[in-house]
Amino acid sequence: MNKRISFIFLSAIFVYSGYCVLQLGMTWDVLLHHELGKDRLHYLFSLGSDKLNEETFKNTKYYSGAYSTISAFFTYFLSKKYIVESIYFVNLVFSFFAIFGIQKISKEFFNKQIGKITFVICLFNPIFFGHMSMNSIDVAMASAYIWFFYTIIKYLKKQHIEGKRKHYVLFSALALGFFMGIRFSFLIMLLPIFLFVFLEIFYFKILINKKFSIKNFIKDAVKVIIIAYLFMVLFWPETHSNIFLLPIQFTMEGLFHSFGFGPPFVLYNGDVVGSYEIPKSYILVNLYYKMP
């Protein structure tokens, strides 16, 4: 009975979310991300023979663009007549992945009931729900971050089981690569997860099994980093001429420039412009329009 009620509830929520997708207008940057994704998708499918459109997409070397490329791929299977709605639908699916991931993490740390409550709270959070469809970056990053953390938790618990260990190594690598492939410069956000893993292995020892192997952990960590890095640069064509130096170079250029600390170029009203060109009143205006 409980499963039936849960299924009806989830179905109703998904249908309502789909209805919201149809009601939303086009955000100022949605087509820019989509066209950028298409440009890189054509480059990848042509194995590099189709050159990137550097005239239209200036300064995009600072954006690794994994999600834009993957989103563009999925929209090819949906109606081109409703391209904006198709993009929003893909965003919606990744948003639900994020919420289900939060539920699973809560279940691991507490219990199944707490997991369900967390699911509902996150879903009905107006800030998150309002971004579920229209946000082409943040919800995907949240989903990747959450699932990376979840697979790390499962790895710590099940490392002694060889089959599960390989499974979680692969999925954590893909989740990490997806996160890095959206914004490599946001890598610092993973610091709490790394700190949690360090404390769990060497101090708390609550999740890990007695058979937990430090040696295997180090080997698996190296595998995760290599796979994640290769996944990231795959969707970052501007780095393909030197995948070891250019990602770091572009990231540093994006963080430090002649005007001080911060990205030299940002997306503003659908265009890539210099940070110094943004009006000083933009933050206040932006916050005003996000008020309930």
Indicate residue ranges for each PLM-predicted region.
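Membrane-interface alpha helices of multi-pass inner-membrane proteins
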Residues: 19, 118, 168-183, 286
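Transmembrane signal-anchor helices characteristic of membrane glycosylation enzymes that use polyprenol
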Residues: 2-30, 38, 42-45, 179, ...
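Loop-to-helix entry region of an early transmembrane alpha helix in multi-pass inner-membrane enzymes
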Residues: 61, 65, 69, 79-97, ...
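Membrane-interface transmembrane helices that cradle and orient dolichyl/undecaprenyl
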Residues: 1, 148-168
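Transmembrane-lumen/periplasm boundary regions of multi-pass, lipid-linked membrane glycan transferases
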Residues: 41-46, 63-65, 69, 79-80, ...
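Transmembrane-helix motifs of polytopic, lipid-linked glycan transferases
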Residues: 89-109, 147, 151
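Short helix- or helix-capping micro-motifs
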Residues: 13, 118-123, 130, 150, ...
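Transmembrane-helix signature of polytopic, membrane-embedded enzymes
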Residues: 4-9, 102-124, 143, 167
